[in-house]
Curated annotation (Swiss-Prot):
Glycan attachment positions: N28, N101, N119, N127, N131
Designated gene of the protein: Emcn
UniProt key word Transmembrane helix: yes
Keywords, comma-separated and alphabetical: Glycoprotein, Membrane, Phosphoprotein, Signal, Transmembrane, Transmembrane helix
Residue ranges with Polar residues bias: 28-43, 65-135
Name used for this protein in its record: Endomucin
Length: 261
């Protein structure tokens, strides 16, 4: 029994030693000598594409430190590159001066084939390659101004040109009508002023005529202005007449008396 126990212990010890040696060999195989690791960069010059860098990928295909073959076989390396659509580019060129505007829109479609190739080589794993293609559409709207033969013409939209032209034509026609046809409706000032002047002249004439009438038909200095007022010459003539009549009558009476006697 002791012999059997001793043999069993011997086999167990030998087995454990073998397993430990195998583990050391595996660990030695899994941990390589320090080799130079390089980084793989996938970059594209077209704008809008994201460049991806995989720093964990070694150059000689050996896994990084601290990993075993079984762990590496269970993990899979997947590199995905997202392609982004580029924005629209609007280019405007403008020059000053007497120019004519011309607008044109150009659409350019450029297919972008393989943006990146990511290759990973591992022991016991398959090679994986991903190719992505994106289509970039660049829309360029260009506004150019060309020199015009006439330096004073400003180029604008057709609608504004037509409206401005029609307005100028209407203005010209109205100006011509006003210049050719005289105004038939007189203003109030042209009526009122002559009337006022005529009234002033008439009043002046009336006053002058009345003054002349008074001067011409003025009474004579012999005629009494009032009933009681008489000039001295008239009084004297009346006295003389009365004296003559009285003397004549007295002479007749005396002659008659003489004849009776």
């Amino acid at each position: 029994m002791r012999l059997l126990q001793a043999t069993v212990l011997f086999f167990l010890l030998s087995n454990s030693l073998c397993h430990s040696e195998d583990g050391k060999d595996v660990q030695n195989d899994s941990i390589p000598t320090p080799a130079e690791t390089s980084t793989t960069k996938a970059s594209v010059t077209i704008p809008g594409i994201v460049s991806v860098t995989n720093p964990n990928k070694p150059a000689d295909g050996t896994p990084p430190e601290g990993t075993t073959k079984s762990d590496v076989s269970q993990t899979s390396l997947v590199t995905t590159i997202n392609s982004l659509t580029t924005p629209k580019h609007e280019v405007g060129t403008t020059t000053e001066g007497p120019l004519r505007n011309e607008s044109s829109t150009m659409k350019i479609t450029v297919p972008n084939t393989p943006t990146s190739n990511a290759n990973s080589t591992l022991p016991g794993s398959q090679n994986k390659t991903e190719n992505q293609s994106s289509i970039r559409t660049t829309e360029i709207s260009v506004t150019t101004q060309l020199l015009d033969a006439l330096p004073k013409i400003t180029a604008t939209s057709s609608a504004s040109l037509t409206t401005a032209h029609t307005m100028s034509l209407l203005q010209d026609t109205e100006d011509r009508k006003i210049a050719t046809t005289p105004s038939t409706t007189p203003s109030y000032s042209s009526i009122i002023l002559p009337v006022v002047i005529a009234l002033v002249v008439i009043t002046l004439l009336v006053f002058t005529l009345v003054g002349l009438y008074r001067i011409c038909w003025k009474r004579d200095p012999g005629t009494p202005e009032n009933g009681n007022d008489q000039p001295q010459s008239d009084k004297e003539s009346v006295k003389l007449l009365t004296v003559k009549t009285i003397s004549h009558e007295s002479g007749e009476h005396s002659a008659q008396g003489k004849t009776k006697n």
